[in-house]
């Protein structure tokens, strides 16, 4: 059952949606419908889902190798809105730690002197 939820989307846009609107983003199997996704999230994470929005991002080409040309697998992206007083603690802490690491990398890149300039 959990195989249908592939992984949470962790980037700046999803973190902003989490903080401002209490929305979580997941990539899920293409075959799932909105009612199935809602039931799956409510059962697995024990939260109350207010709304489910879905979309299918465009396919991306694979690195061209003559023996295996084609596209990457398709997936469905889901935006789940929870009630204001509820959260998924594991995903929230995962996003916060990744955001902190990314901000640290940006600060290090800005403060380190550029070795190419001489």
Curated annotation (Swiss-Prot):
Gene Ontology molecular-function annotations: rRNA binding; structural constituent of ribosome
Cellular component terms (Gene Ontology): chloroplast; ribonucleoprotein complex; ribosome
UniProt keywords, alphabetically: Chloroplast, Plastid, Ribonucleoprotein, Ribosomal protein, RNA-binding, rRNA-binding
Superkingdom of origin organism: Eukaryota
Compartment(s) where it occurs, according to its Swiss-Prot or TrEMBL record: Plastid, Chloroplast
Example GO biological process: translation
Function: Binds to 23S rRNA.
Family: Belongs to the universal ribosomal protein uL23 family.
Oligomeric and partner information: Part of the 50S ribosomal subunit.
Listed PANTHER family: 60S RIBOSOMAL PROTEIN L23A
Name of the featured protein: Large ribosomal subunit protein uL23c
Native source species: Stigeoclonium helveticum
Lineage: Eukaryota, Viridiplantae, Chlorophyta, core chlorophytes, Chlorophyceae
């Amino acid at each position: 059952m959990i195989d249908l939820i592939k992984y949470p989307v962790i980037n700046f846009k999803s973190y902003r949606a989490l903080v401002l609107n209490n929305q979580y983003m997941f990539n899920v199997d293409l075959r799932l419908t909105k009612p199935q996704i809602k039931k799956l999230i409510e059962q697995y994470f024990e939260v109350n889902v207010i709304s489910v929005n879905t979309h299918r991002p465009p396919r991306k080409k694979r690195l061209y190798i003559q023996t295996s040309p084609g596209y990457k697998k398709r997936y469905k992206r889901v935006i789940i809105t929870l009630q204001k007083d509820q959260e998924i603690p594991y995903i929230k802490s995962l996003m916060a730690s990744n955001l902190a690491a990314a901000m640290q990398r940006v600060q290090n890149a800005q403060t380190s002197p550029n070795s190419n300039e001489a």
